[in-house]
Amino acid sequence: MYIRSLELRDFRSWPELKVELKPGITIFIGRNGFGKTNIVEAIGYLAHLSSHRVSTDAPLVRANAGDARISAVAVNQGRELAAHLLIKPHAANQGQINRTRVKSPRELLGVIKTVLFAPEDLALVRGEPAERRRYLDDIIATRRPRMAGVKADYDKVLKQRNALLKTATIALRRGYGTEEGAAALATLDTWDGQLARLGAEVMAARFALVQDLSSQIRDAYQTIAPESRPAAVNYKTTIDQGLAQFGEFDAGIIEATLLTELAAKRQREIERGMSLVGPHRDDLELHLGGQPAKGFASHGETWSFALSMRIAEFNLLRSDGTDPILILDDVFSELDAGRREKLVGIARDAEQVIITAAVSDDLPANLADAITARHTVTVRDTDAGRISLLDEQPDTQP
C-alpha cells in the first residue's frame, strides 16, 4: 500500500498542501515547529481517526478556520481509493470514500493503513495504561474496522453507567427498599448487561491480538537489543482471577465473568461512584527479564521496547497481506547507531516510508541511496499567523 497524493486544507499550520507521493522513501526536512510533523499527523489521523499528539480535534484546525480537511488517494495492489475527512471541532466529523459520503468516519478505517513511530511512543513504556490500551485498540480497528464501532459503543455505555453511579448514589444505596432505589438498580442492571456484552468483545479482541503480538515483540526486541534482557508482554484484566478457571478467552466466557465480577463489585462501585470492572481498566504489561519495563528500563531499553512494539505492529499488518505505510517522525536523531541500522533495514524493505527530520544530518548515511523524494518544509509569517510551506523559501520581506 502507498499514498499517491495528499491534500490538506486548514490542518494545523497548513492553510493548503498538495503533494504527490511515490512508493519508496520520502523525506520531509524542516526545523522544529515548521510543520513537518503536521503532515504525518494528518496521514495518521486519516488512518486511525485520532492523533498521536493530542486527544481532541480542536488543535488540528488552523486558527480562525471553521474546519480542516484531509484527503488522500491510496493505492493497494493496483486499486485506488480516495479518502476524505472533514474535521469539525464543534460538530461531528464527516467522511467520504471516493465521491460517496459515508454514514460514519469509522468507515474510513482500513482504507489507509499506517504504522507511525514517533518520540511520543516512549509513553507506550513509561506512560499510563491508557496509552497501551490505545495501542492495542488502534491495531484491532485497522485489522477489523467493525471493532472501532464496538469500542465506541462500549465507551458510551461506560459513560452512561458512570453517570448513573455518580448522580444516583443515594438511591442506589437505598436499594430495593424504595421505589427510587429499585428503579436506579434496574437501570444499573441494564447498563451491566451492555457493559459486559460489549466489554467482552473488546477484551476478546485484545486477548487475540496480544497472542499474535507477543512473539513478534519478543523477537523484534531481541534483534534490536540482543545484549538486553528478554522482553515479554501480558494482557492484564480486572477479571484475571475469574478467567483463570476457564483457560480460554472467548467472548461468551468473558461476558459471563464480567457479569459475575460486576455483581461482586457493585457495592464498591456505588460507594466510589465509578465503574471498577471492564476493559477500560485493563493494561498491556511490559516486562524485561521478569521486571516491569516501566520504572526499571533504561532510556535505551525504553526506546528499544517502544520500537519493537511498532515493528511488531508493522510485521503483523504485513502478514495480513498488505504492507502498511511506515511513518518515522523525527526519531533517527534519538536513536543510537545500532537501532538506526535496524530501522533503516525495515524502511528499505517497506513499500512506502515517510520520514521527517529537522536536518539532513539526522538521517543515517546508509539511507541516502534509497530516498525517492525529498521535500523541504519552511514557514512564512502572515497577518493571519504563521503558515507552513512546502519546497518554498520563507518570505523575508518585512
Curated annotation (Swiss-Prot):
The positions annotated for binding ATP are 30-37
| Example of a GO cellular component annotation carried by this entry | cytoplasm
**Record has DNA repair as a keyword:** yes
Q: Does the keyword Mitochondrion apply?
A: no
Chief location of this protein within or outside the cell:
cytoplasm
Domain of life (superkingdom):
Bacteria
Localization (cell): Cytoplasm
| GO terms, molecular function | ATP binding; ATP hydrolysis activity; single-stranded DNA binding
Give the GO terms filed under biological process for this record: DNA replication; DNA synthesis involved in DNA repair; double-strand break repair; SOS response
**Which CDD domains does the UniProt record give?**
ABC_RecF
UniProt KW keywords: ATP-binding, Cytoplasm, DNA damage, DNA repair, DNA replication, DNA-binding, Nucleotide-binding, SOS response
What's a Pfam family this protein contains? SMC_N
Per the similarity annotation, which family is this?
Belongs to the RecF family.
What is the protein's known function? The RecF protein is involved in DNA metabolism; it is required for DNA replication and normal SOS inducibility. RecF binds preferentially to single-stranded, linear DNA. It also seems to bind ATP.
How is this protein named in the record? Answer: DNA replication and repair protein RecF
From which source organism is this entry?
Corynebacterium efficiens (strain DSM 44549 / YS-314 / AJ 12310 / JCM 11189 / NBRC 100395)
Species lineage, top-down? Bacteria, Bacillati, Actinomycetota, Actinomycetes, Mycobacteriales
**Record gene name:** recF
